[in-house]
Amino acid sequence: ASNGEAPDALGAMYNHLERRGNIWGLTSDVRQKFVASAGLETFDASRHEYLMWLGCAGSYDGDFQKSLRSLFSILRAHGVTFGVLARERCTGDVAKRTGNEYLFQELATANIADFQASAVRKILTAGPPCLKTLGDDYRRLGFDVEVVHSAVFVSRLAPERFSASEKHSDSSSTPEVALHDPCYLSRYAGHADEPRALLTRIGAVLREPERSGRNPFCCGAGGGLLFEEHEEGTRISQRRFEQLQATGVATIVTACPFCAIMLKGAQASANAATEVVDLMTFVDGRIRPASAGAPTAGAQGTSEQAGP
């Protein structure tokens, strides 16, 4: 897109970003309804340690909003204080990855101004692309704050907060899962161990698929491919789903809304019984509330920068 030309699907997405500030072109009332129903407070630096960045998926995707509710439940149970901006616009991740630097700069400049006006110092996000953009690309623009992904944050909660008696609250048997590593979380930010540690601590047994850890196989959404019109042939998402399904598990866990979208699409195409579940949804209910006086996760230095 750097030369002014882009496929129709990307061109439509750019238009959505310019007009509505999100990749799907949805109106802000969709986000506002979710914020209200989830009981989210507007960020106030004097009361909230973290800005919760919802992102396009968290603001507008119904399935991922269910996952965020699980995350909010975990954070509230452990005394983590967080709020959201009254208004969000996309970080510009897809514009950046597909070569539309002008649009990225426009979105980033506006977002940085909002962050600075609200005195934001720590950002918590559940989207690996947002982690990469906020923690790396924005840092290169001079906005250098702590940015942490929710999977990393929750994995570093004090070990005593994980209740052995609740590990298998939904089943009498040990759950076996395959973990799909999001590229921006594992390969670029280097966080392959934390999701695994979290799953292990709640009693899950991991069955590793082909290409995992810090050398994952992409879900097929990265680099703007989420918006590409695919030609005939096997899609990347289908190939990845087959690799995960080959582990023989009934549940595939991931920590990225766009990975979930792609894998669920492949699951539906294959008419497979294997379910795709967000990590926070999987662990919600398996972590007991923090005891009175215990330090919050934020007090343990969970924040990380994304990227090199």
Where are these regions (language model features)?
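Ferredoxin-type iron-sulfur electron-transfer modules in oxidoreductases and energy-metabolism complexes
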Residues: A1-E18, E106, A110, E146, ...
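Iron-sulfur (Fe-S) cluster-binding segments and ferredoxin-like electron-carrier domains
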Residues: A1-N3, E101, D136, G190-H191, ...
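Iron-sulfur-cluster electron-transfer modules
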Residues: A1-T133, D137-G142, L157
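A short, charged/proline- and glycine-enriched loop
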Residues: A45-Y50, S171-V177
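Local cysteine-cluster metal-coordination motifs and their immediate loop/turn environment
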Residues: G55-S59, R87-T98, T125-T133, D181-A189, ...
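Immediate flanking context of iron-sulfur cluster ligation sites
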Residues: A77-R87, A117-S118, A204-F217, R239-T251
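Short, flexible loop segments at boundaries between secondary-structure elements
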Residues: F143-E166, R211-R214, A268-G298, E304-G307
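Redox- and metal-dependent alpha/beta enzyme cores, enriched for Fe-S-associated oxidoreductases
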Residues: P159-F162, V177-E229
